[in-house]
Design a protein with these regions (language model features):
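Small/polar-rich, solvent-exposed N-terminal microdomains that initiate assembly or binding
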Residues: 4-36
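Short secondary-structure capping micro-motifs at structural edges
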Residues: 41-49, 63-64, 80-83
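Helix-rich interaction surfaces within compact, conserved domain-sized segments
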Residues: 78-134
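Short, solvent-exposed beta-alpha or beta-beta edge segments that form flexible loop/patches at the rim
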Residues: 27-51
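Short connector loops at helix/strand junctions that flank enzyme active sites
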Residues: 29-31, 52-56, 89-91
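Mixed-charge, glycine-accented linear interaction segment located at domain edges/termini
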Residues: 122-157
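Short, conserved charged micro-motifs
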Residues: 67-73
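Oligomerization/assembly interface segments of phage tail-like spikes and tubes
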Residues: 53-67, 122-124
Length: 157
């Protein structure tokens, strides 16, 4: 989800409490805080040697001991408005950083008003080759190769 889409959902429901649903369907405790809004810039070289750049907006959550805390959509919208100078774009993808045993980042797949809450459905990221045309591919015929056809010989010492 893009930042501009997220902000529109927040603006449309400013009084609703936020709820974050992890990809496994487990909800982040409702008293979670959004403790950080960041622009993450990544510059890297892919496996084919091509220089690449990527940027996203990351919202960090934190579950504190104050069980009565609730974050409403309007407050998060205000925080995002204050962060506009560092975000520099509303076209950034948004992800949520959350710690549940370890720190993980989840892309925001959708936001919808459900049963009086603004529910963020979080997804998962997968790795992929960014330069498939440059990667080594097996020669024709080798793709059907079976390891069981190999003859193993002991290595001489």
């Amino acid at each position: 989800m893009k930042l501009n889409e997220l902000k529109a959902a927040l603006a449309a429901h400013p009084d609703l409490n936020l709820r974050f649903l992890l990809p496994n369907g487990v909800a982040v405790p409702e008293h979670a805080h959004v403790t950080e809004v960041a622009r993450i810039d990544k510059r890297f070289v892919d496996c084919g040697g091509k220089l690449r750049a990527d940027a996203l907006c990351r919202l960090q959550t934190w579950v504190a001991d104050d069980l009565h805390h609730r974050l409403v959509a309007g407050k998060l919208l205000g925080i995002l408005t204050k962060a506009a100078a560092i975000l520099q774009s509303e076209d950034l993808e948004v992800d949520i950083e959350h710690e549940a045993g370890w720190i993980s980042q989840f892309p925001v797949e959708s936001v919808a008003a459900v049963n009086g809450e603004l529910v963020f459905r979080l997804g998962v990221r997968h790795t992929a080759c960014l330069a498939e045309d440059q990667c080594m591919r097996p020669p024709p015929g080798l793709k059907d190769f079976k390891l069981s056809t190999l003859e193993f010989k002991p290595i001489a010492k």
